[in-house]
Amino acid sequence: MLDLALTSDQEQLVATVRDFCAREFAPTIGANDRAGHHDPEIFAKLASIGLPGACFPQRYGGHGLDYLSLGLVCEELEYVDTVFRTVLSVHIGLVGMGLYTWATEDQKQRWLVPMARGEKLACYGLTEPNAGSDVASMQATARRQGNTYLLNGQKVWVSDADTADFLLVFAKTDPKAGHRGVSAFMLDRADHSKTLRTEPIEDRLGIRAGDVGSIFMTDVEVSEADRIGDEGDGFKIAMSCLDNGRFTVARRCHRHGAREPRRLGEIRS
């Protein structure tokens, strides 16, 4: 028979994260949501208890926890507010796991290690104003010039766009090839202060305390070493990243499904 009980380590993890969220996040989230204010210290607080590196191997600065443990962490963050779960979902699920799967060893040392250590925050830029999340129809381009590329285009509805240090973005290296012409690039905000710009999307209906924004790229010059995978691998990488990220979203739904019957009972009583 399949044993679905949590291990003692997993139970301790849940208790630790639950207590942390109650102490650090719960007291201010209501006011921040009403005001549309994003606390820029969220990631630093998550890093203070090692959550950004939860499921990455220790050789990359992580803690080597299993994927179920990541789901449990996300459930506890979600219980307080989706803002906190989203930060970790994007950082680990969309970007970190993508790098762990597709990046070279040098790239992992360059990007994944500081991410897992909680030193750098990452975001994921796929959606566009005129294409949505239809990768084949994206308009952002990466024009090759020798050993470099010039990236131009816009990404929207990007979680942590304004606060992220690293940005995983997708652009067409072959605009005529549909989804087969998309490539993936990792940008370090510090290297592109003059050509990379981000802006918050304000007065949103939901996730008002989150950092959600747009990315604007104007002749952002990157090298071949900044490309993840080969040219044309962008679609596969994007879908792989989304698979990992959606796991944490599913845990969000599981958490709400377990919580709402209790709330309904409290209301009826």
Which role does the model predict for each range below?
Residues 2-13, 197-269:
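Glycine-rich beta->alpha junctions and the first turn(s) of the following alpha-helix
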Residues 14, 37-41, 62-70:
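A structural motif shared across PLP-dependent enzymes of the aminotransferase-like
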Residues 48-119, 159-166, 178:
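Internal helix-loop-helix
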Residues 50, 74-78, 171, 187-194, ...:
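Short Ser/Thr-interspersed hydrophobic loop/turn segments at strand-loop and sheet-helix junctions
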Residues 115, 130-133, 157-160, 174-176, ...:
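Short Gly/Pro-enriched turn/cap motifs at secondary-structure boundaries
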Residues 118-126:
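A short, Trp-centered hydrophobic/proline-enriched beta-strand micro-motif
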Residues 140-143:
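A structural signal for short hydrophobic beta-strand segments in well-ordered beta-sheet cores
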Residues 148, 152-197:
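A short core secondary-structure module
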